[in-house]
Amino acid sequence: MQMASKRALVTGINGFTGRYMAAELQANGYEVIGTGSQPSAAPDYHQVDLADGPGLRALLAELQPDVIVHLAAIAFVGHGAADAFYQVNLIGTRNLLEAIAACGKTPECVLIASSANVYGNVSEGMLDEHTPPAPANDYAVSKLAMEYMARLWCDRLPIVITRPFNYTGVGQAENFLLPKIVSHFQRKAPAIELGNLDVWRDFSDVRAVVRAYRGLIEARAVGQTVNVSSGITHSLREVIAKCSAITGHTLDVQVNPAFVRANEVKTLCGDNARLRALVPGWETPALDETLGWMLAGQ
């Protein structure tokens, strides 16, 4: 007799990560239901705003999911209105947790996506989960506040918090750096304006990130805060060289002083030892493979 599939609720399912998360869960036997703030004709989709506490409570009472992956957030650090970070990332997440706790069924796992931005700009080198947070912008402060708030619910709900470092893939918006670079190579643009090329960052593949999330859910990593990172750094200069080698196109890179951040940290790298211990065998593709996939656009 076949076991009934587990029901997974993915908030922000129509976002960049949400689409990959849904595919990953469906491929592994989950029944996936999604929410978002915008209308959608997608099946098993419910439009509900995180600000709508009564709407969330009614929906959770109806759905009673086995697992929840909370991805809905304002994720672009350069987003203009600071108060939106707090309304969505902090208050919205609290509304969701309140709705889950009141729904009449305790889920197996509630995975909440935070961000490695909480570590801020004060630390060089390898960052692990014990590195003291030092958020440097409203986005990061909202995510760290969300983490602290979520911990208030840990006696009632099985929560795991992830801190993903930079990740990318096909379909990510061009206001993020790697899709911007890839797009210029795809169009064979003659030139690109960037900031400091000699910063080193930790890049993962979105397909590996959602595998990590599923692995953490299935490992029942409840109560844990977990970095999701490659543990390897690449400079932006190196990223451009890799794209050039893959496409055969040469891009004239112009440094725009407006894009150079003051006091920018040269190297940021995430220690993924905790993730690897919880999800044995997890790894992210080499950056060349991810860039090749993105440049092919499929």
Describe the function of each predicted region.
Residues R187-Q298:
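C-terminal substrate-binding subdomain of Rossmann-fold SDR/epimerase-dehydratase oxidoreductases
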Residues L50-V88:
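NAD(P)H-binding glycine-rich loop region in Rossmannoid oxidoreductase-like domains
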